[in-house]
A protein has these predicted regions:
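Active-site acidic/histidine proton-transfer and metal-coordination neighborhood
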Residues: 16-17, 61-65, 76-184, 264
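Acidic/histidine-rich catalytic cores of soluble enzymes
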Residues: 2, 19, 29-30, 132-134, ...
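Conserved, mostly hydrophobic/aromatic
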Residues: 5, 22, 30, 60, ...
């Protein structure tokens, strides 16, 4: 496993400074959240974006850092409503906005030599039935997966509390409809603790071969709030042992997007907590 950090937790840093900081603090992977001012795929100047992508890729390479592309920016597609629109939108034209964004993310992932693109479903509108929602989502993912296949970029789908696909069981229902070799999982350890029943480690063992990306933070049962390590109720050693047991070698990305006001402290505290559990110096 490669200890990593999500750039959504460094919103007040220039991306180049965030990458340098993470490398200096001993991180080995970066989850790059595409956002305003950070590899914005809607940059008005395509040449500027291309130059930024090359510079970021070269900087990551120079530091020997792994990387995934994250698509969870809050207001990138709609400055007035968070995480809108989504693949669950009943309006095909609005779904197409999210599809286009994900296709742009796939293109950037290819140019960055990223290991995967992480994504989620979004929330369903009131009254959406289970079968209807699964069919809508699977259909919306079709063009995205086709683009991922053309570019050779795996997708890592994240179950998210409050969204239509919130549990492993619902992911399994979607996966049955998708059945694509580039369609795998982002597992957020806090989300599993928040919403699933049973030990986190058991879920990791069940889904081990499908885990392409991991988010990690502390959390409490039933409360979707990303907490600093030690402030929640997760027992981390069995979880990390299970990830090692299933042979997971990707990024273990700390996700503390609401800690940006104290980002440097959060970066250091997170590593101080996790490094001994991972056998890092």
């Amino acid at each position: 496993m490669k200890l990593g950090y999500n750039t959504n937790g460094l919103p007040h840093h220039r991306l180049r400074d965030a990458i340098d900081l993470l490398a200096e603090e001993g991180y080995r992977s970066v989850a790059l959240t595409l956002d305003a001012g950070a590899l914005d795929p809607y940059d008005d100047d395509p040449a500027h974006l291309a130059a930024q992508v090359r510079a970021v890729r070269d900087r990551l390479d120079r530091h020997g850092l792994g990387r995934v592309v994250e698509t969870g920016a809050r207001y990138l597609l709609n400055p007035r409503q968070k995480h809108d629109p989504t693949l669950m939108d009943p309006d095909p034209a609005r779904r197409a906005i999210r599809q286009e964004f994900l296709q742009k993310a796939i293109d950037l992932a290819r140019d960055l030599d990223a290991e995967a693109v992480s994504l989620w479903s979004g929330a369903a509108t009131a009254g959406t039935g289970e079968a209807e929602g699964l069919e809508r989502l699977a259909s919306a993912l079709g063009p995205v997966l086709a683009h991922a296949e053309r570019r050779g970029i795996p997708l890592a789908f994240e179950p998210e509390p409050g969204f239509f696909i919130d549990t492993f069981a619902r992911f399994a229902g979607l996966d049955e409809r998708i059945r694509h070799p580039l369609f795998d999982l982002t597992v957020d350890i806090g989300h599993v603790h928040c919403i699933e029943t049973g030990a986190i480690a058991d879920h990791v063992r069940t889904w081990g071969p499908r885990i392409r990306n991991v988010h990690i933070e502390d959390m409490r049962v039933g409360v979707h709030d990303h907490l600093m390590f030690g402030e929640g109720t997760i027992d981390f050693p069995p979880v990390l042992a299970a990830l090692a047991e299933v042979g997971y070698r990707g990024g273990l990305h700390v996700e503390l997007s609401r800690h940006g006001h104290a980002a440097v402290e959060a970066v250091r505290r997170s590593r101080a907590f996790l490094a001994p559990l991972l056998g890092m110096g």
